[in-house]
């Protein structure tokens, strides 16, 4: 008798995705981050659901409702900090996942890659709206500054911003709609994840060598299930340590001050995972130019498959490209640092140099280096 997991219409889909899925035997731990992202999404949806039961999306009570969750709700404090720091873990895994895709040429699977870019935008939008909900000073002013960027769009900018605000400033209507979208988007993300996996399983995973691995496959279970469980346990350990020992390490102290439209904080800045994009935005003196650079800093991922000039898929055997990749990683860390600094000398010029370098590496240096490596291989 055939196993039910191979014949049942529903179980068959799960079986083909998580049990009998052929995986290249050479995939390393860099391939773990997909499952870690799924775990992060599950943690965020669960903690978010319970937080939503106690949160009120009204300007008069939002800040107090978060305080109430932390003080009066059973284990409310741990839910709140798991959710806040879970977002940080989410972005750490997300950036490593994208970095692995760049390093090992996973962008050659264009459908999977493009859905991934869409997912990145959706997660960033969700995180931004979530940051507004506690209605502290940084929530209010962050929402004001970032939504105001849309006013740089010619002709329709001002009307568009007021339409998003639901009034003439960030107020009750804005908070209510941000809560509605923040609740809805993770479920849309979950649906997109299924589509992401659907396209991935059409082609199968890539591997560190970049050569076809059809003759050398292993089943997903038990090899990669055990490997993924280990990764998830390690991530949950890190998250638990962050939540239990220093829950406010990655947050902004200004967000413990209730939102006040009459008092601007000295340094308005987003959460750490947006600082690199914020630094690129600030490095351009022109408003529209800054907004375009901000969007392009993420959207540039979409043109990377077109810029692939190497005869090899991955960077595993391309030392010059590896140097550029790690230079790009260092540049992003520099931008993250600059984004958290005040707008003054020498931070301005460092930010501008790092922003120019970011686009130069991706658009110019990487394709040219790949061409050079192709010629070196002829020797």
UniProtKB/Swiss-Prot annotation:
Binding-site residues, heme b b566: 97, 196
Gene Ontology BP term (one): mitochondrial electron transport, ubiquinol to cytochrome c
Membrane topology: Multi-pass membrane protein
CDD domains attached to this UniProt entry: cytochrome_b_C (cd00290), Cytochrome_b_N (cd00284)
Transmembrane segments: 33-53, 77-98, 113-133, 178-198, 226-246, 288-308, 320-340, 347-367
Any one Pfam family match given in the protein's UniProt record, by short name: Cytochrom_B_C
GO terms assigned for molecular function: metal ion binding; ubiquinol-cytochrome-c reductase activity
Note: Heme 1 (or BL or b562) is low-potential and absorbs at about 562 nm, and heme 2 (or BH or b566) is high-potential and absorbs at about 566 nm.
Family: Belongs to the cytochrome b family.
Name used for this protein in its record: Cytochrome b
Organism: Pteronotus macleayii (MacLeay's mustached bat)
């Amino acid at each position: 008798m055939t196993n039910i997991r191979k014949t049942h219409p529903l179980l068959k889909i799960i079986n083909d995705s998580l049990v009998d899925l052929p995986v290249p035997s050479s995939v390393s731990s860099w391939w773990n981050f997909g499952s870690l992202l799924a775990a992060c999404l599950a943690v965020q949806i669960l903690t978010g659901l319970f937080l939503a039961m106690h949160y009120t999306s009204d300007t008069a009570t939002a800040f107090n409702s978060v305080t109430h969750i932390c003080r009066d709700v059973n284990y409310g404090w741990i839910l709140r900090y798991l959710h806040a720091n879970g977002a940080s873990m989410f972005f750490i895994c997300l950036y490593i996942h994208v970095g692995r895709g760049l390093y090992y040429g996973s962008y050659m699977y264009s459908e999977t890659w493009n859905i991934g870019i869409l997912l990145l935008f959706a997660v960033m939008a969700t995180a931004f709206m979530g940051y507004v909900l506690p209605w502290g000073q940084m929530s209010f002013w962050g929402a004001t500054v970032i939504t105001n960027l849309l006013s740089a769009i010619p002709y329709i900018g001002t009307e568009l911003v007021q339409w998003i605000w639901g009034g003439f400033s960030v107020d009750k209507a804005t908070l209510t709609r941000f809560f509605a979208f923040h609740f809805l988007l993770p479920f849309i993300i979950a649906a997109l994840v299924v589509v992401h996996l659907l396209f991935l399983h059409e082609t199968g995973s890539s591997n560190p060598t970049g050569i076809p691995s059809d003759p050398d496959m292993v089943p997903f279970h038990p090899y990669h299930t055990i490997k993924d469980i280990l990764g998830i346990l390690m991530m949950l350990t890190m998250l638990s340590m962050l939540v239990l020992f220093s829950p406010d390490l990655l947050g902004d102290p200004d967000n413990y001050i209730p939102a006040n439209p009459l008092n601007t904080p000295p340094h308005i800045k987003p959460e750490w995972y947006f600082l690199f994009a914020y630094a690129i935005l600030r490095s351009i003196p022109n408003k529209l130019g800054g907004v375009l650079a901000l969007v392009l800093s993420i959207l540039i991922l979409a043109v990377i498959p077109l810029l692939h000039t190497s005869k090899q898929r991955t960077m595993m055997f391309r030392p010059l490209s590896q140097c550029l990749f790690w230079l790009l990683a260092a540049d992003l860390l520099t931008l993250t640092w600059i984004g958290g600094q005040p707008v003054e000398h020498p931070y301005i010029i460092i930010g501008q140099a790092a922003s120019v370098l970011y686009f130069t590496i991706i658009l110019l240096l990487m394709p040219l280096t790949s061409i050079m490596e192709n010629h070196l291989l002829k020797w």
